[in-house]
Amino acid sequence: SAQVMMSAIAVLVATVGVHTIGTLRREAFAAKQLGQYRLKQKLGSGGMGDVYLAEHQMMKRPCAVKIIRPDRARDPRMLARFEREVRATAKLSHWNSIDIYDYGRTADGTFYYVMEYLPGHNVGELVEEYGPIPAGRTVYLMDQVCSALQEAHGIGLVHRDIKPANIFCAYRGGVFDVAKLLDFGLAKPSFSSSNGDAQLTTEGSITGSPLFMSPEQATGEDQVDGRSDIYSLGAVIYFMLTGRPPFESENPIKVMIAHASQDVVPPRLVNPDISPEFEEIILRCLEKDAEHRFQDVASLQRALRELDVDDPWTSARAIEWWSCNGCPERKKMAAELVEAAAL
């Protein structure tokens, strides 16, 4: 009947319309290009901008492109932080710090920088998806983070935003469980700088992530040194082993007050499998008074290496774990994973 025919035509038009819209959206996204970099897939979003999987058009090298969001690009302080993140990270060459490839601005005023692409999980994702991380693997990963921080601290650079989301557990160069320290957007020289970088953060302002910030950051102290990063490392280790941060509240102010004034619940009360020796290391990192913490990252790293853990993590165990669990972004590295695990 005519009514049936009209219904069929309507369905056909709707189907074609949806297909056309979908095609146009895909083509619009595929057309996104920044200089020599073609954006392929959105990987995530942060406080300042969005991160995309991209490819260099000439070299065909996969990379990650971070683009500052338009609403943030109008804020001079955000632009300063974005630029500082690029410059601070570009000073670092350690294997466990993320590599920066490029930095630029498009004709329409979009700021971006290009970094190495990391297939894997950040520490927050690891804990969320698989639960607390065993002591052996925690030591294995944090030993690498300590190495990256030694280089940063050695040139007077304090990270100031160490947290699970900024520590990536990656597959790089045929190696599994490579720890990468990310996001130096809050980094600040611990000594006076002639180029003015030290003035990019307002004196007395609160910087960092409340769940993992040091007491001196929580109270807005101007003089923050590498021992502040050591506190944050201790807070991250606490989280890795217990599945929860040292202090929790829906109110960030309460969390900061707790960091500054309250005793932390000993991690062994949360996870009895933690050894007394490991707990001692964590609690020393989390001392309120910076003078009572490890005084440098090298000292913390030595303590971690001297720790006698029941389940030492090895490269072989890392391959086994990754072959069983893969990545949260399932499409990232399936072929590479199967090949490497079979070797």
Residue ranges and their predicted role:
Residues D102-G104:
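A short, aromatic-enriched beta-strand patch in the conserved N-lobe beta-sheet
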Residues L149-Q150, F168, S209-A341:
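C-terminal lobe helix-coil module of Hanks-type protein kinase domains
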Residues L141-M142:
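Activation segment signature within eukaryotic-like protein kinase domains
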Residues R69-K91:
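AlphaC helix of the eukaryotic protein kinase fold
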Residues A170-P215, T219-Q223, E250:
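Activation segment of protein kinases
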Residues C146-L157:
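Protein kinase catalytic-loop region centered on the HRD/HxD motif
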